[in-house]
Design a protein with these regions (language model features):
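TPR-adjacent "capping" and linker segments in tetratricopeptide-repeat scaffold/adaptor proteins
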Residues: 7-16, 170-175, 246-247, 251, ...
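Alpha-helical segment of the N-proximal tetratricopeptide repeat
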Residues: 13-43, 56, 60, 187-188, ...
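Structural signature of tandem alpha-helical TPR/SEL1-like repeats
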Residues: 26-35, 39, 60-73, 94-107, ...
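TPR/TPR-like (Sel1-like) alpha-helical repeat modules
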Residues: 142-146, 154-162, 173-176, 202-213, ...
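Helix-start (N-cap) detector for alpha-helical repeat units in TPR-like alpha-solenoids
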Residues: 14, 48-49, 82-83, 116-117, ...
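Structural marker of alpha-solenoid helical repeat scaffolds
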Residues: 43, 77, 111, 145, ...
Length: 477
């Protein structure tokens, strides 16, 4: 076979091989394209773009390690190339290495003009780290560039939902006796159609805002519904009093939906920049809730039969305690996207909570085939194994869960129970101390420490832990 000498390769020869590689790639012949690019980088080892293209081919074929090596070589030669940083970020995201994903994606963002994919993956990465404010910011930018991407819209809706819950928690914590806190509770009960509880909260809110006409209308309406009357919601919606329930009876669609989303986003930015008060925190929470709802409507409007639309329906059914309906919808998700993470887990977890262990196990195991690094699935499989007396298997699952999530208190408690039953008290103490470190406010660890110390004959230590337990139990929540 005739060997090609690197120095003898003409520009025309190189162009020909490049053309052949591109033709093979366009035809879907990834192996031939890969072989061509491998030849090119051997002959021109300083050609950064060829390494980047080779990395793309490895990535398309699921060869992540080879792709990473090619991308790193590309940016070593030419640091201003943005593409390799993006794909390194995507690979790191898939490997759950979120710090590396952020680092690479932010570098790609700095090197390239606004790009929907970079904003999307930055949003997904922030979301995976529970940095929901940052996630929403990136996903808003992605949605502005492409308002039809259901994955972007789904994660944006969920980010807004998490931010709403965080803001409601802040409202309750800092302004527990405020009329706005009471009003937020009324909205929660009304959304669940718990008319008696809703009317009671509206009554309490009206005591603090006795001159508010709309609040009085809401009280009378919920009282009528609590009494069984088929009363329609009277009056005109008030943005302050109705807030997150503004669209309960009439949902916007088409251009009006986009207009309302933009208006709510603008309103939210103003609220976040203003001074903090009970009213502002209430409005922030309610506006996040509105945005979560509107963005979910955008998912349904974009593709009502998409896997994300069915996933949102499943989650709504789960929140309303309709587990059977939720499972049906989760299975509809799997019909459309069998490899979507967290769906088998959602089904298995619903079965697990109801102690339907035979149905739960195969779902949780299926989740681990898709995502072996799912700490909660590992924990629940450990719990199933412990329940059936398979303590060695349970121990293995719990330890694997803790490798991924060292602060999982439930797994530490589960291991303590196994070790205590087996007389391995030092291991019991180790995991109780770790549970205490993970959540110092929980008195349970102190009580269980006292029991283990008592078994070891360390009565003074046991008395101390019981005293701490009693003190924490008596502390105001």
């Amino acid at each position: 076979m005739l060997a090609i000498v690197p120095g003898a390769l003409s520009q025309d020869d190189l162009a020909r091989i490049y053309s052949e590689a591109q033709q093979a790639q366009a035809a879907g012949d990834l192996q031939t394209a890969t072989n061509k690019y491998e030849a090119i980088v051997r002959l021109r080892p300083q050609m950064a773009e060829a390494y980047a293209n080779l990395g793309n081919l490895y990535y398309q074929q699921g060869q992540a390690d080879r792709a990473k090596a090619a991308y790193r070589k590309a940016i070593q030669i030419k640091p201003e190339l943005g593409g390799p940083y993006f794909f390194l970020g995507v690979i790191a995201f898939g490997e759950h290495d979120y710090p590396a994903a952020l680092r690479h994606l932010q570098r790609a963002q700095a090197l390239q003009p606004p790009n929907v994919l970079i904003h999307s993956y930055l949003g997904y990465t922030h979301y995976a780290r529970s940095a929901f404010r940052e996630a929403a910011g990136e996903l808003e930018k992605a949605a502005a560039l492409d308002g039809t991407d259901i994955d972007v819209l789904y994660h944006l809706s969920k980010s807004y939902g998490h931010l709403a819950r965080d803001s409601y928690a802040e409202l309750q914590s800092q302004f527990s006796d405020s009329a706005y806190t009471i009003l937020a509770r009324a909205h929660l009960h009304e959304s669940r159609e718990d008319w008696k509880a809703a009317s009671e909260q509206y009554r309490l809110a009206l005591e603090k805002m006795p001159d508010n006409r709309r609040l009085r209308e809401k009280l009378q309406w919920t009282q009528a519904r609590a009494a069984g009357a088929p009363a329609s919601n009277p009056g005109t919606n008030d943005e302050l009093i109705d807030a997150s329930l503004m669209y309960r009876d009439s949902s916007p669609s088409g251009p009006k939906l986009k207009e309302e989303m933009v208006r709510s986003q603008s309103k939210l930015r103003e609220l976040l920049q203003g001074a903090k008060s009970d009213k502002s925190v209430y409005l922030i929470a309610e506006t996040y809730q509105v945005l979560s709802f509107l963005t979910s409507l955008a998912v349904f409007e974009t593709d009502p039969d998409s896997y994300r639309a069915h996933q949102l329906r499943a989650q709504l059914l789960e929140e309303s305690k309709n587990d059977e309906g939720a499972i049906v919808e989760y299975r509809n998700v799997l019909k459309r996207k069998p490899d979507l993470q967290n769906i088998h887990f959602a089904i298995g977890s619903l079965y697990w909570k109801e102690q339907h262990f035979e149905e739960a196990r195969p779902e949780l195991e299926a989740e681990l085939k898709i995502n072996p690094n799912h700490p909660q699935a590992l924990y629940e499989l450990g719990d199933l194994s412990a329940f059936t007396g398979e303590t060695q298997i349970a121990e293995k699952y719990f330890l694997e869960a803790l490798k991924l999530e060292p602060g999982m208190v439930e797994a530490h408690f589960a291991l303590e129970k196994i070790y205590t039953q087996n007389g391995r008290f030092e291991k019991s103490l180790e995991h109780l101390q770790k549970a205490l470190h993970a959540n110092a406010s929980d008195p349970t660890a102190h009580y269980r420490l006292a029991l283990v110390y008592r078994k070891l004959g360390r009565n003074q230590d046991a008395d101390r832990e019981l005293a701490i337990f009693s003190q924490k139990q008596a502390a105001p929540k």
